Every structure is written in C-alpha cells, then in structure tokens.
C-alpha cells in the first residue's frame, strides 16, 4: 500500500508548465517572484486553487484520476490508499504557497481542498485516508515569526481545520507529521531544548512525539468517537561526515522507533531519504552515503539499526542506544508523562511542568 503526496508545482517535480493548465490550477495569489528567490524564502509549491470554479474542477479531476486508478480491485497499477494534501502547509510560503494570507483564511481554503479530496477518494475506496501535512513547529512559533501571513504554528492550522470541518460537516481528515529534530542539522533529538510535554510546546519532535496523539485524542477532535490517525511521513537524522554524528543518528532512530511503537494512533514512520541527496540544503539524511556517480554508497550505522528492528537483534540495539544516550534519559523519553493542558508560563516565556 502507498500513501501519495499531492503537490501543485509550477516548475518543479516534472511540471510541463502548460500555461493553460497553470492559469487555473495554480493559486491566484501564488508568489511567482519567489520561485527562485535569493532574498528570502523560495516558493517551491503552490497551494491548490480553491478560489475559482475552474481551479476546483482541475483539482477534482486530478484527485479522481489518482483515486480511480490506484484503488482498482485488481490492483493493476498498484494500490494508493491515502493522499497527503500538499506539503508542510504551516510553512505555506515555501511548500504550499498562496502568497500573503492569514492562517485562518489559508486553513479555510486548505480544509476545502482536504474535503474535496476526501469526497473524490471515498467514491472509489471507502477506507481511503486524507492527511494534512505539518512540519515540527507547533504552538506560537513558526519558521519565520516576522512573516505571520506566510508561516504559521501547526496547532493553529489543526484548530482552524477542526473549526471549518465542524462548520461545514465533519469528515475524517488525519495528519501527516514531520517530527524532525529541532535543528535539522543535529540528529540527537533526545537533546532538543524546545520540545516540552504539554499541548503548548513550541515544537513537536521525536523527543515529545507523544504530545501529538494526546492532543488529537481530545473529545472535540474525535470523528465518530475515534481519534484521527497519524503518519510520520517525513523525517531524518542528519550526518555531518563523521563517525560520531552517524552513530548519533543510528541511536536516535532506535529510540524514536521504540517511542512510536507505543503509540496506537501512529500508523507509519517513514524516512525522508534512502541515499544522501546533494540538493537537500546541505543535509545528509540518507541511510547510505552517495557515491561520486550518484549511486548508493556505503551504508551508515543507521542502516543496520533499521534492519534489526522487529527482529531478534532488536533487543541488543535497544541496549546499545540506551547506553549511548544514557539510561536515565532514554528511559524518561521512552515513557514520558504528558500534561493535558497549556502549561504554566514563567517570566522567561518557558513552561513549567
């Protein structure tokens, strides 16, 4: 089974840049001037156009085609039973651009896109799932606080999506989350400083990943009495060209995997890259190095840790990770206590738990 990510890219990811198609399919407020920006963030992907009838028509045709083709009973073309709508929409200026737009307005349109995809997909497969895509910025923080109409806190998007879905008729949207470490360059998420264990945490990374299912388990978020599902559809542990950071990444993966296994509403945990990517903003997120000819290189330590999960060798890997990270920290993060509330702010703006 495959979960697909639906993207609306004007110039990347194989776009043929058909002017007639783009005139209706690209969001009317897309920041064309930021496609190759050297001064500020780059607009890689457009939001889906929910503002015109023509835009919605192209979008529905796109989703209908994929849903019909990839949910056939004979699985002739394979199976695709879930759609992630756009990418990291709380950082919309880069990954789902609709220009300058307050979070409430952006999320209203985004919820429409999720709803249309849900309607189209459910016609062909009753168990199809639709996912909202979020990065690790959660509450009262975002990628660039000076640009509040371009970058949002993930929790605000989730809360507005609930508001609009209840207003217009509830449906079972879910969340595709990216719990990267707080600094993507450093693989040791277990040493993250920003994540806390309340609903008001600034970030949700693997360190406090338990907060996300706890937040969605609140009664107001339930759909027909059941919590919304979560997939961890993108994450990775950067290596810096040295043995120590590679070992950090391997041990981090082991702990992350143990934490996620304990969370019933998380259905999938998939890595961002199998092989290091030269164009990944300086990050090396693969399980393997990359050769000079761009073929897969030597496996990193994380490769062997992943290989040993859910095998008799897993217990030894857990022992290694516990010793490397520190038994007290490892055990505390494996069984954290979540405070179901906002936390108590102190004078520095941090939270006391």
In which residue ranges do the predicted regions lie?
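Substrate-binding cleft and catalytic face of glycoside hydrolase catalytic domains
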Residues: 1-144, 182-183, 276-281
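Helix N-terminus capping/helix-initiation residues
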Residues: 52, 101-102, 153-154, 208, ...
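Extracellular serine-dependent O-acyl
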Residues: 80-86, 225-233, 262-277
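Noncatalytic carbohydrate-binding groove/subsite architecture in carbohydrate-active enzymes
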Residues: 13, 59-62, 67, 73, ...
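Short, solvent-exposed loop/helix junctions and linker helices
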Residues: 52-56, 202, 206, 296
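Short glycine/proline- and charge-enriched loop/turn segments
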Residues: 42-43, 98-101, 191-196, 286-288
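Aromatic-rich peripheral "rim/lid" segments of glycoside hydrolase catalytic domains that contact
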Residues: 34-36, 41-43, 94, 239-353
